[in-house]
C-alpha cells in the first residue's frame, strides 16, 4: 500500500501524541522498537515477497569508529538519528545518507575498560526537538535535533563506580528514563527518570537493596525496598553490590501508564557469596512494573529466583494483545537468557504461560500456579559442578525480536549452549579485573537459529539454522536479519515459513536490528553494521579493522558497498624463548584481566586487536609502554600499572607470544593451565 511521504516539520518534532500513534505513520520509525509495543513490525509493504529480489544498496555511510555497532536508528520526517560505539551520534539524510550533523561526547578511553562487552550503544530517543543519548561514562545527554548541539547533560551514575550506559533511553510523558550496566563488576542497579526539558531528576528506583546501615535512599523504591525486597536477601550482600542492572529494556505501556524494566544478573553470580545461599534476591532477573509518572512499584515477576547462572532478564519485550483460551489478553512477551518464552498478563503481572525454546537443564518447567521454575538438585552447583543449559551466554541475548500480527508469530535469534559451573573457593572481588562471578566455568556452543515461535500455543512454528542478529518484520510478508561476526550478510525471509528470498553481502558483520521507513514515496530498509562486543568474536576469522557503516537498501538501489577487509596480519611472536613457568603465570594474568576484551586463548577477530598479531609483541619496551604505561589509553586500552605488578607485564607478553607461536606453527590454541582450575572464561557479551 502506498504511504504518504513526510511533511515539513521542525527537526525532531515528536510529541506524546505522535509516539502513541506511531503505527499510523509507518513512513517513520519514531521509537526504539517502532512503537511503544516494541513489535518491530512495519505496515510498509512496497518491498514484499514478490519484488524483494530486486532490493539493492541505496547508500551507505561510514562511521568514525571500528568497534561494535548495536544501535537501532530512529527516523523522523526524513532524518535518521543513530548512535555508534563510544556513544557518538549522527544525523543523516534518510534518503541519501548525507551527514547533517555529528556529536562526539568525548568519552574517555579509560571508561572503555569498565564495559564488560565493548563500548557499544543501542540507540537514541527523539522528543520535542531533542535527541537523547546515554553515554558510556554515565551521562544522559540532550542534543538539539537540528544542530546536534548540547542542550543539557547530567550524570546518572557514580562516576567512580564500574557502572556504564549502553542502552537506549526511553521517553515517556515528558520524562527520559535510563538504566545502567555493570552487574558483573559489583554495582547496584537502578533506573532513573529525568525531565526531558531540563535534565532534572524526577525519580529513581533501585532494583536491589543497598547498605542497611545507610538507611533509605530517598528514592521511589524506598517503601517497597524495605517491605518486600530486602527480606529476600541475606549475608553481606551490600558489600558485593548485588547487581540487578537495567542495561537494556525499558518499555512503556500506555494502556496502564506503566513502564516495564528488565533487570540483570546477580553480583556475584554465585548466591553462596552474594546472599549466603538464601532468599530469592529481588529484583534480580525480573520484569518490574512501575508507575510512569512517579516510579512507584506496581508489580513484578521474577523469572529466576536466587539467580546463579547469569540468566539476566534485560532482553527485549513485546507488548501486544493475544486471544488466549477465548479471551483477549493484554500481554507482555519475553524471551530472556534462561531459555524459556514467557507470556505475562500486563495488568496483574501474573504468568499466563511459559515454555522452553531450547534444551534446559536448570529447570524442567515453569509452574504456572506459582510462576516459579521447577529446578533439579544442585542447579546452583552447591554440591559440585553443574552442567547448565543454556549456558551463561544465554539462549537469547540483547538482540531484538519481532512480532507480526499478520502471522501471530514472534521471531527471535536463539542459540543452544552450555556451561559447566562450580563454586570458586578462592573467590574475592577484584577491581577492574576479572568478572566478579564467584564461579569456575567452562563453556560450549551448539546450534544457532532464527526461531519463529507461536506465543499462544507456546511452541515452535519453524526455524532456520544460522547465527544472526536482531529481527525486523513487515507487512510485505518479510523478515529482515543480519548475519556475520566479521564480514556479514543481510537477508530477507518469508515470515510464514522462513524461506530465504534474498541476501546481500556486507563488508561488516551485523548484530543490530534493521528498520524500515519511506521518503519521497520510496521504502528503504536500513541497518547499522559492524560486529564487536569483546570476546564474543574470539573464534571468528581475524580481519583488518574497518569502520562500522549504516547501509540503506531500496528496490533498484545503485550504490556499491566497499569490499570485505583483508585478513589480519600474521602472528608476530617475540623472539623468546620464555621459561614455561613464566608462560603459565602470564596465562593466569591474561585470563583474569585481558580475555574479556581480547578473547579467550588470545583469539580475537581483531575488531579489538588480536594480541598474537600485535606489532608491539616482539618489542619488550613497546609492549610495556602500552600495557603498563597506557600509551593507547585514548583508544580504550588503559595502562594496568594500578592493578598489576611490574613483572606480570613481561609474563603476560610471554604467554601471548606462546599463543602467537602456536598460531604461526598452525597449532591449535590452548591457554596454559596453572593447577587444577582455570578462571572463568564466560562469553557473556551483553551489556
Regions found by a protein language model. Give the residues of each.
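Blade/loop signatures of beta-propeller domains
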Residues: 4-57, 214-224, 372-376, 439-440, ...
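Repeat-blade elements of multi-bladed beta-propeller folds
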Residues: 29-33, 68-88, 113-139, 164-185, ...
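Extracytoplasmic beta-rich repeat domains
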Residues: 61-72, 102-125, 153-168, 206-249, ...
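Short loop/turn segments that connect beta-strands within beta-propeller blades
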Residues: 93-96, 144-147, 196-198, 292-294, ...
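Blade-level signature of beta-propeller repeat domains, shared across WD40, Kelch, NHL, RCC1
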Residues: 515-567
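His/Cys-centered metal/cofactor-coordination and adjacent catalytic loops
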Residues: 560-582, 595-614
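Flexible coil segments in periplasmic/lumen-exposed cytochrome c-class electron-transfer proteins
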Residues: 565-593, 635-687
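Gly/Gly-Pro-rich "capping" loops immediately C-terminal to redox-active cysteine motifs
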Residues: 587, 599-629, 636-640
Amino acid at each position: 500500500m502506498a504511504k504518504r511521504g513526510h511533511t515539513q516539520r521542525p527537526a525532531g518534532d515528536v510529541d506524546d501524541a505522535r509516539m502513541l500513534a506511531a503505527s499510523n505513520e509507518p513512513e517513520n520509525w519514531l521509537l526504539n522498537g517502532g512503537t511503544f509495543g516494541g513489535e518491530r513490525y512495519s505496515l510498509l509493504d512496497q518491498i514484499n515477497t514478490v519484488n524483494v529480489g530486486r532490493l539493492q544498496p541505496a547508500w551507505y555511510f561510514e562511521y568514525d569508529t571500528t568497534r561494535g555497532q548495536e544501535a537501532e536508528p530512529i527516523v523522523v520526517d526524513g532524518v535518521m538519528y543513530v548512535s555508534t560505539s563510544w556513544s557518538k551520534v549522527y544525523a543523516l539524510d534518510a534518503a541519501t545518507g548525507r551527514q547533517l550533523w555529528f556529536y562526539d561526547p568525548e568519552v574517555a578511553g579509560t571508561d572503555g575498560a569498565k564495559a564488560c562487552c565493548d563500548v557499544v550503544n543501542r540507540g537514541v530517543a527523539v522528543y520535542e526537538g531533542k535527541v537523547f543519548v546515554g553515554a558510556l561514562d554515565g551521562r544522559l545527554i540532550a542534543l538539539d535535533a537540528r544542530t546536534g548541539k548540547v542542550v543539557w547533560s547530567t550524570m546518572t551514575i557514580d562516576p567512580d563506580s564500574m557502572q556504564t550506559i549502553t542502552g537506549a533511553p526511553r521517553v515517556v510523558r515528558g520524562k527520559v528514563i535510563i538504566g545502567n550496566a555493570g552487574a558483573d563488576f559489583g554495582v547496584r542497579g537502578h533506573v532513573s527518570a529525568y525531565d526531558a526539558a531540563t535534565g532534572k531528576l524526577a525519580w529513581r528506583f533501585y532494583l536491589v537493596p543497598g547498605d542497611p546501615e545507610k538507611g533509605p535512599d530517598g528514592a521511589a523504591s524506598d517503601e517497597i525496598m524495605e517491605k518486600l525486597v530486602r527480606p529476600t536477601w541475606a549475608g553481606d550482600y551490600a558489600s558485593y553490590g548485588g547487581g540487578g542492572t537495567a542495561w537494556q529494556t525499558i518499555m512503556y505501556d500506555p494502556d496502564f501508564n506503566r513502564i516495564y524494566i528488565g533487570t540483570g544478573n546477580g553480583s556475584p553470580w554465585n548466591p553462596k557469596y552474594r546472599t549466603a545461599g538464601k532468599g530469592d534476591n529481588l529484583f534480580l532477573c525480573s520484569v518490574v512494573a512501575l508507575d510512569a509518572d512517579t516510579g512507584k512499584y506496581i508489580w513484578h515477576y521474577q523469572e529466576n529466583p536466587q539467580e546463579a547462572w547469569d540468566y539476566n532478564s534485560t532482553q527485549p519485550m513485546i507488548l501486544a494483545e493475544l486471544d488466549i483460551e477465548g479471551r483477549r489478553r493484554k500481554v507482555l512477551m519475553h524471551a530472556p537468557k534462561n531459555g524459556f518464552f514467557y507470556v505475562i498478563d500486563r495488568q496483574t503481572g501474573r504468568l499466563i504461560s511459559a515454555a522452553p525454546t531450547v534444551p534446559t537443564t536448570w529447570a524442567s518447567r515453569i509452574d504456572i500456579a506459582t510462576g516459579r521454575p521447577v529446578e533439579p538438585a544442585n542447579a546452583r552447583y552447591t554440591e559440585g559442578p553443574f552442567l547448565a543449559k543454556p549456558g551463561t551466554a544465554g539462549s537469547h541475548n540483547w538482540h531484538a525480536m519481532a512480532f507480526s500480527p499478520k502471522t501471530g508469530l514472534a521471531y527471535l535469534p536463539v542459540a543452544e549452549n552450555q556451561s559447566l559451573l562450580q563454586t570458586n573457593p578462592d573467590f574475592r572481588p577484584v577491581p577492574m579485573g576479572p568478572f566478579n562471578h564467584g564461579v569456575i566455568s567452562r563453556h560450549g556452543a551448539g546450534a544457532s537459529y532464527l526461531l519463529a515461535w507461536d506465543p499462544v500455543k507456546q511452541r515452535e512454528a519453524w526455524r532456520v539454522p544460522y547465527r544472526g542478529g536482531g529481527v525486523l518484520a513487515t507487512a510485505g510478508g518479510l523478515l529482515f536479519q543480519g548475519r556475520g561476526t566479521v564480514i556479514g550478510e543481510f537477508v530477507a525471509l518469508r515470515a510464514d515459513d522462513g524461506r530465504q528470498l534474498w541476501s546481500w553481502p556486507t563488508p561488516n558483520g551485523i548484530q543490530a536490528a534493521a528498520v524500515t521507513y519511506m521518503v519521497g514515496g520510496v521504502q528503504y530498509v536500513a541497518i547499522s553494521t559492524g560486529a564487536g562486543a569483546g570476546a564474543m568474536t574470539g573464534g571468528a576469522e581475524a580481519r583488518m579493522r574497518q569502520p562500522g557503516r549504516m547501509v540503506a537498501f531500496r528496490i533498484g538501489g545503485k550504490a556499491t558497498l566497499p569490499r570485505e577487509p583483508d585478513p589480519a596480519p600474521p602472528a608476530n611472536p617475540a623472539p623468546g624463548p620464555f621459561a614455561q613457568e613464566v608462560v603459565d603465570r602470564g596465562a593466569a594474568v591474561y585470563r583474569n584481566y585481558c580475555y574479556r576484551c581480547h578473547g579467550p586463548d588470545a583469539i580475537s577477530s581483531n575488531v579489538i586487536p588480536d594480541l598474537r598479531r600485535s606489532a608491539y609483541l616482539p618489542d619488550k619496551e613497546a609492549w610495556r609502554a602500552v600495557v603498563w604505561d597506557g600509551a593507547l589509553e585514548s583508544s580504550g586500552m588503559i595502562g594496568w600499572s594500578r592493578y598489576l605488578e611490574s613483572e606480570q607485564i613481561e609474563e603476560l607478553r610471554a604467554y601471548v607470544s606462546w599463543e602467537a607461536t602456536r598460531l604461526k606453527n598452525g597449532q591449535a590454541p590452548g591457554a596454559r593451565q596453572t593447577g587444577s582450575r582455570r578462571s572463568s572464561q564466560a562469553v557473556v557479551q551483553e551489556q
